[in-house]
């Protein structure tokens, strides 16, 4: 029976060891394992959230880039249209200025031509009167002179 008492003593010692381990050793180990599992799970969730945030940020950046390109294209088109409009306006203004200058020059030429004609008429009338005076050897009075000049001027 010695063996039974030894076996009983070992069983009691083993039971006390198991109880001691369950009471004092097992809870901190289980707590450490659970803390580690929670930490790993939180890390995985954070990584998943970060990946989703990254995907969202990349999508937003892509959308913003597309929007910026579209806006830039619109601005370039507007600038080109404005450039063409400014060029057309400048051409129209230049054409109007050219026409104005030509009209003014033609008017000046016409005025100068009329002045030259009047001057020439006066000279021709004066020469005609001088010639007529020499032919007639007499002087024409002022009223007759004026009538003759007006008549000759009108005919010329």
From Swiss-Prot:
Principal localisation: membrane
Domain of life assignment: Bacteria
Mode of membrane association: Single-pass membrane protein
Gene Ontology cellular component list: plasma membrane; proton-transporting ATP synthase complex
InterPro entries per record: ATP_synth_B-like_membr_sf, ATP_synth_b/b'su_bac/chlpt, ATP_synth_F0_bsu_bac, ATP_synthase_B_chain
SUPFAM superfamilies attached to this UniProt entry: F1F0 ATP synthase subunit B, membrane domain (SSF81573)
CDD domains with a match to the protein in the record: ATP-synt_Fo_b
Quaternary context: F-type ATPases have 2 components, F(1) - the catalytic core - and F(0) - the membrane proton channel. F(1) has five subunits: alpha(3), beta(3), gamma(1), delta(1), epsilon(1). F(0) has three main subunits: a(1), b(2) and c(10-14). The alpha and beta chains form an alternating ring which encloses part of the gamma chain. F(1) is attached to F(0) by a central stalk formed by the gamma and epsilon chains, while a peripheral stalk is formed by the delta and b chains.
HAMAP family: ATP_synth_b_bprime
Family assignment from sequence similarity: Belongs to the ATPase B chain family.
Name of the featured protein: ATP synthase subunit b
Gene from which this protein is expressed: atpF
């Amino acid at each position: 029976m010695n063996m039974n008492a030894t076996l009983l003593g070992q069983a009691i010692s083993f039971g006390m060891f198991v109880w001691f381990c369950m009471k004092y050793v097992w809870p901190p180990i289980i707590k450490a394992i659970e803390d580690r599992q929670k930490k790993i799970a939180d890390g995985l969730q954070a990584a998943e959230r970060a990946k989703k945030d990254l995907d969202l940020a990349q999508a937003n950046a892509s959308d913003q880039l597309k929007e910026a390109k579209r806006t830039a294209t619109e601005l370039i088109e507007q600038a080109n249209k404005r450039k063409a409009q400014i060029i057309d306006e400048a051409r129209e203004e230049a054409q109007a200025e050219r026409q104005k200058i030509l009209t003014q020059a033609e008017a000046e030429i016409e005025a100068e031509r009329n002045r030259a004609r009047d001057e020439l008429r006066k000279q021709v009338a004066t020469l005609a009167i001088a010639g007529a005076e020499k032919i007639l050897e007499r002087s024409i009075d002022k009223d007759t002179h004026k009538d003759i000049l007006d008549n000759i001027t009108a005919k010329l």
